[in-house]
């Protein structure tokens, strides 16, 4: 798949199936997406090529990709995301800045690891900003999704009592993740 997009950096092996619905969907900066665009924010794989200034020794490393594309000056102006402002994890190969690529050694699968930066990063930010501490009660709406599942687990690790809003079919899974109680979402 080396066609209209350029350098192959990491083999994309997983994504959370996040897609844009129309050509008018806006990016994080409020601009319309440029199409064609390959979606996918969640990426884990192996480095197959590197750009200028990056050690060739990195080729073959198993890596996790931070999907947040920050400007070189460190500002939060014009922040972009892999799979939105740049081709993403649905591609066979993904080109990202070396600063967004992190070596990882784990028994977890690529699919499991790929969920960490976006879903778990979002959940961690939410719980940190809310200052969730031991003994508090956390109600998680949307507990069946990726971010919701991460909130259930991370809130439980903080010692919070978690109530997960989910479907009856997925209630057992949410309890296994650490929810103390579940509420059927159509109730």
Q: What function would you assign to each model-found segment?
A:
Residues 1-3, 74:
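Cytochrome P450 core scaffold surrounding the K-helix E-X-X-R motif
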Residues 4-69:
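Glycine-rich beta-strand-centered segment in the early N-terminal region that forms part
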Residues 26-34, 66-142:
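NAD(P)H dinucleotide-binding glycine-rich loop of Rossmann-like/cofactor-binding domains
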Residues 47, 57, 63, 101-104, ...:
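Hydrophobic packing within well-folded, soluble alpha/beta domains
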Residues 59, 74-75, 150:
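Short glycine-/acidic-enriched loop or helix-start segments at secondary-structure transitions
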Residues 108-186:
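Mid-domain Rossmann-like dinucleotide-binding core that forms the NAD(H)/NADP(H) cofactor-binding site
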